[in-house]
Each structure stands twice: as structure tokens, then as C-alpha cells.
């Protein structure tokens, strides 16, 4: 991986760590299928009351399936494939424009020292995560 790609990935990790962002890859379909499937099965077995019980149990199962799948955004960034990193790199470099840097420390200082640039890079990162990875983004309180 070219050094500049690695620098940009580390910058993205630093920005997301500072803002304490977590992501979850969407798996709502699995939760909905669990709720619907158990509601259907409950209806077959217990009639109208079975639908209610099956739906409630399925909803809890769906919630349990989804829980614990949030990861810190820096971890998600470091787990990107080389192709995904290259696409994210292109998005970020388009914002950085003609800025030149020698190492990740200098790049991080340049971006963190410019609130507007920091906001634009963060927005591009979150947009990439949402669009390309279909992930939910949450800020830790």
C-alpha cells in the first residue's frame, strides 16, 4: 500500500477516534425475518395470541442478533480491503486538494488545525462508511 494511502487511513482513524464514532453494518433484515418468522410460526401454533407472542419473542431475538455489532470506526477503517481503502483515499484526497505532507503526523496536524478541513474530511469519511459499507454511524455519548 502506498505510504500516502496509509497516512490518510491513519488520519481517518484519528479523526473518528477523537469524535468517538462507532459503526454497525446493517443487518436489520435478519432481525425483521426473525420477528416475522416467529410471529408466523406463533400464529400457526397458537392463533392470534400466538402471533403476538411469536412477534414479541422474534423482536427480542432480532434485537439480540443486532446487539454487540458496533465497532469503533478506527477498527472498521483498518479492516477495509485495499480496494476499499483506495476508494476512501480518493474521496479524502479530493478534499485535501493540493496539500502536501511528508508523514502522517504532519497530515494530521494540518487537518486538525483547520476546522473547516477537519469537518469536510470527517463528512467524507462518514459518507463513505454509510454509502459504501451500508453501515450505521453512531456517536458515543
Swiss-Prot record:
Q: Which GO terms describe its biological process?
A: neuron development; skeletal muscle fiber development
- Give the bilayer topology: Single-pass membrane protein
Q: Name one Pfam family in it.
A: C19orf12
The UniProt keywords, alphabetically, are: Cytoplasm, Endoplasmic reticulum, Membrane, Mitochondrion, Transmembrane, Transmembrane helix
**Record localization:** Mitochondrion; Mitochondrion membrane; Endoplasmic reticulum; Cytoplasm, Cytosol
**Main location (coarse class):** mitochondrion
Q: Where are the transmembrane segments?
A: 37-57
Using the record for this protein, list the coiled-coil segments as residue ranges, or answer none. Answer: none
The Gene Ontology CC terms held by the record are: cytosol; endoplasmic reticulum; mitochondrial membrane; mitochondrion
Keyword Endoplasmic reticulum listed? The answer is yes
Disulfide pairings: none
Give the UniProt family note. Belongs to the C19orf12 family.
Q: What is this protein called?
A: Protein C19orf12 homolog
This protein's species is Danio rerio
